[in-house]
């Protein structure tokens, strides 16, 4: 599992990383977590991620623009918007983000969201393999 965390405020990158690692450890899941404090770096990385936690208000690329770019690489990516702002909620929903979480992070909401995201990813993988098997006539 590959996870990206991007926020232009490094304290939120670190806080999110710690909380997500703790949740994953409770679920016995290993993940590679890449940290970004620049929207340019993640926008241009070209990497495939299963889950991304994105701040919304960043320069030069907003979290919405970064999410669009990440979805171009993996249309099944699970996007969490982590922000202090309510006014971008409609834009985020238009992009079908998975969760919109306000700062400071509510650990209970984050844990619930991450666990649901993991279930969704598992279901997508199972569906994909069943589709492959049925195409091969197995």
In which residue ranges do the predicted regions lie?
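Acidic, metal-coordinating helix/loop segments flanking the phosphotransfer/catalytic sites
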Residues: 35-51
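A short, hydrophobic beta-strand element within the central beta-sheet of small alpha/beta folds
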Residues: 76-86
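A Lys-centered signature of the CheY-like receiver
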Residues: 103
